[in-house]
């Protein structure tokens, strides 16, 4: 199969990641739950991985790197832990439901009021709206780094500066960019960065986390076993234990650690250059085919995603045909991004997303171009 659904999950993992998970399953104990060698080795792997993530994302304190099972959990921890009744929040039309649904629920429960920065017909945010929507009670701007639908990126350094100038927190969903695009929390004024391991970081599913700037207090989202301060009735106050109740996914974190080593060895810039070259090759190959509509802005910063429709064909039918007759994996439908589809006018038809990763080749791209051309001519 030609796998072009990497914005959902990166299918092909580096061999070192697979080896690390297999080794961990036979050697790792439960970190913080014993003084024997297996428990201590697990604790060392977990702490080392915190340090690697802190270095990658520009987080000044590894203890403020919190492990979760994915970015959805990370976002729920952040968004349910920083707001008080009466707070105002700004988000955008580019968001995934992992941002939207926690915010909608908080709005429904009367905790927050909520405004959205609109996107235009190409999926670009109105940057002036970030300023115009600011209120005295604005507690945070919450936004994605890149749309999972179009690949268009938000200039988070620009938005972070606006948030900092107004005394608001800046929470970033880096699901589509972690490992694929350089991120520096300090330079970009990011207060809370939420990420997943199974996409650009090329780590196992079930890994992810959030990085928290010093001085930011987040209430625990879940409480329970911590391995320390066990006689206290409340969850320990210090990070990371404050937000990490229960046994961590040590086996997955071992794989994430190996993935970070691989990423550092190859280099994010090299990976980004390769992915963008594949994306550009595909875009150039399909953009002039009659009956093809492509969504998004290809003149600004973006990820390696091309989303399109063929004539008025149902996007799910197109994706099914690509899989069945051409052995090409893509993602159709709504992509958990309803507001973006409404901005693009594709809420009924959906769209077919092609997303490229480090392991893809030019041969993969050329086969996909040929398939799209043939289907458009049917």
Where are the regions that the model predicts?
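Pyridoxal 5′-phosphate
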Residues: 1-378
């Amino acid at each position: 199969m030609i796998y072009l659904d990497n914005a959902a999950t990166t299918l092909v993992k580096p061999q070192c990641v697979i080896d690390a998970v297999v080794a961990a399953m036979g050697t790792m104990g439960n970190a913080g739950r014993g003084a024997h060698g297996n428990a201590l080795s697990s604790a060392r792997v977990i702490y080392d991985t915190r340090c690697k993530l802190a270095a990658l994302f520009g987080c000044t304190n590894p203890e403020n790197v919190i492990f979760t099972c994915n970015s959805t959990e990370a976002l729920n921890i952040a968004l349910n832990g920083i707001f008080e009744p009466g707070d105002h929040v700004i988000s955008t039309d580019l968001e995934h439901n992992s941002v939207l649904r926690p915010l909608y629920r908080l709005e429904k429960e009367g905790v927050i009021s909520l405004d959205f920065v609109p996107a235009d017909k190409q999926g670009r945010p109105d940057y002036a709206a970030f300023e115009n929507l600011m209120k005295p009670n604005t507690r945070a701007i919450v936004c994605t780094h890149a749309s999972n639908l179009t690949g268009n990126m938000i200039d988070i350094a620009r938005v972070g500066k606006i948030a900092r100038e107004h005394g608001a927190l800046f929470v970033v969903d880096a699901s589509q960019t972690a490992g694929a695009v350089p991120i520096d929390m300090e330079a970009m004024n990011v207060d809370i960065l939420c990420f997943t391991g199974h996409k650009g970081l090329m780590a196992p599913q079930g890994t992810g986390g959030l990085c928290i700037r010093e001085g930011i207090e987040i209430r625990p989202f879940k409480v329970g076993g911590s391995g320390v301060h066990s006689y206290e009735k409340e969850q320990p106050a210090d990070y990371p234990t404050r937000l990490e109740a229960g046994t961590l996914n040590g086996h997955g974190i071992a794989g994430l650690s190996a993935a970070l080593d691989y990423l550092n060895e190859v280099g994010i810039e090299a990976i980004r250059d390769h992915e963008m070259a594949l994306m550009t090759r595909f875009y150039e190959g399909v953009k002039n085919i009659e009956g093809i509509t492509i969504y998004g802005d290809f003149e600004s910063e973006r990820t390696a995603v091309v989303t399109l429709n063929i004539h008025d064909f149902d996007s799910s039918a197109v994706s099914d045909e690509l899989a069945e007759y051409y052995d090409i994996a893509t993602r159709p439908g709504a992509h958990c991004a309803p507001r973006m589809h409404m901005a693009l006018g594709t809420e009924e038809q959906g769209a077919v997303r092609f997303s490229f990763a480090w392991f893809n080749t030019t041969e993969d791209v050329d086969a996909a171009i040929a398939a799209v051309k043939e289907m458009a001519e049917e």
